[in-house]
Amino acid sequence: MTDEPVPVGRRTDLGFAKLMPDIDRDGAWLLTLDGTPQSYVDLADPTHLEFEYTRRLGHLADALAPAGQPLDVLHLGGGALTLPRYLAATRPGSRQRVVEVDGPLLELVAEHLPWPGPDPDGAGIAATVGDARVALSELPSGSRDLVIADVFHGSRTPAHLTSVEFVRLAAAALREGGCYAANLADGPPLAFARAQAATVRAVFPYVCLVAEASVLRGRRYGNVLLAGSTAPLPAAELARLFAGDIFPARLVEGEDLAALVGRAAPVTDADATDSPPPPDGAFSVG
């Protein structure tokens, strides 16, 4: 008889992290930081994406290249490495680097939820501790197919990762036709999301925004996905995937995105601020 998995917790650089087993799904774990959900990982089936925002990032990655084709990916923000594990399973041979600022958090995840490291050819997942922007600035130009920014200090995206200067660093790291994707969160009146869309539009000629209809209408707080590229994004395929998901979402691009942005100006380092805090109880769990 095997021991049942039990929750584990540890004080990290950014708060108190807790790994809790999902009693309804063998091999699945929830990572929280100060009570705010950060990641959900299924060790038995890494293609299972529980959270709505990870499913949207998964759909985006699925649509960017033919099925199974390896990608060179930089993940800014690690958590429990949900998306890196997904891509390792769906696109074997991908070279992935994860940058997580919270070293003790990364150690906790490595100890209890280990992942496949890189092989001699560099395929696999390499995780390092560091600041996302510093790591991005040190990358060789044109070295990545996909850059994913999913950085939350607790429940807020740090200001220095929200500016035109930051997005330009991401653009420089991408190969021609590569994609930059940012997972953000905002609520009524969507001032932060509009400004972030304006920021990505100032750098990339092709941009789309994805969110639940209720979030787009300014009725509630929720996740917002922004994607930018130098090449046309597969918008029709993505719109179909997002609309048909168990967490349906709308894709906004072109003139509709311009109308949503309105007069919002791109954010610069000089005026950047952290993303707005969620309303009380928006994401907290025990």
Where are these regions (language model features)?
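A generic structural signal for alpha->beta connector loops
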Residues: 93-95, 122-124, 177, 204-206, ...
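The AdoMet/dcAdoMet-binding core of the Class I SAM-like
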Residues: 44-172, 188-191, 197
